[in-house]
Amino acid sequence: MIQGLTALNPAGKRVLLRCDLNVPLKDSGNGVKVISDDGRIRGSLPTIRELLSLGASVVIIAHLGRPKGEVKSELSLEVVARRLAELLERPVSFSSQIVGPEVLKEATALKSGEVLLLENIRFNASETSKDDGERLALAKELAKLGDLYVGDGFGAVHRKHASVFELAQLLPHAAGKLIAAEVAVLEKLTQSPERPYGVVLGGAKVSDKIGVISNLLDKVNILAIGGGMLFTFLAAQGKEIGKSLFEAESVELVKQLLDRAEKLGVRVLLPSDIWVAPAFANDSPSLVSADQIPSNQMGLDIGPESARAFASAINECATVFWNGPMGVFEFPNFASGTKIVAQALSEVSGLSVVGGGDSAAAVRALGFSDSDFGYISTGGGASLEYLEGKELPGLIALR
């Protein structure tokens, strides 16, 4: 059983808080990186505020991108510290260090109600090391900075990293409000969904979703497949997919999944029409039947008939989980499938869950707000691995 915040007594203590602040950045045009979606920062606010209200000081540990153990200025968390201070409406100190005497001095100087954000933890190669000893050594250095540990970075709980796994075991620990909420929603999806239960999957790679489909097949009533992964499904049915991306090595597995779905009575929805183009660009869209994609074209979105069919199926459901866009939503010509599915999801009267990563970015980019949906998960890979039935290191460590 994962312990909640009430298990700790943080008054007057320094709390090491592992957050997921891995936000997307974009170039503002003058070479300065700005945050394009602050959803993950906002997701961390309830736990930070709760700890501060309980009289703690908070040292935040987080990562940004994949610097691979090197200091990369474009992946500094300094820009995140500024945005966090705005959202918290209080100062947030930023340390350019991760461990060592300088940051120890900064941490021990914190007073109750103060916040310190450390530099990108992944600038230290030991954070993501495959060597248990290296990770433990870093965790021991980090443990010097606080009295208690709270894990709240749901987007990283599937990683066996020093600040997620080893550090939690060195200090009295608990799960933050975000992790508690994420686990409660995912438990409902895997253990007690209200029916009919629909799962809508998209995104580029079917290999990322095979485990999820396999684990959920005997739990769902409707499975709708869109995004780049749908072409592997069409190929498995022997259909012409033109220049569309697909994973030849997954075709046999997909055939097995389709057979199993049929035996279990799961309604599998595949698109009947596809928006195609001659190249991966926002140009020359044309609409074709899903079984007649020309050899010189590639599929970039589900067509309007398919989107309406998906929306209709979603409207029948009491529980819906969606992960992965229906098309290349970044191109306006190929965003309609994702938009129609998102709109249908926002109208579900039961539980609608948007599963992290690209899906969360897509709904925000298309003008929806978080409140339009029952729940938007902050964890892409973490949500999927949980739904696969895997044990996640960051959750094991919080027991």
Ranges and model annotations:
Residues 1-399:
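Active-site loop-to-helix "anion-binding N-cap" substructures in soluble metabolic enzymes
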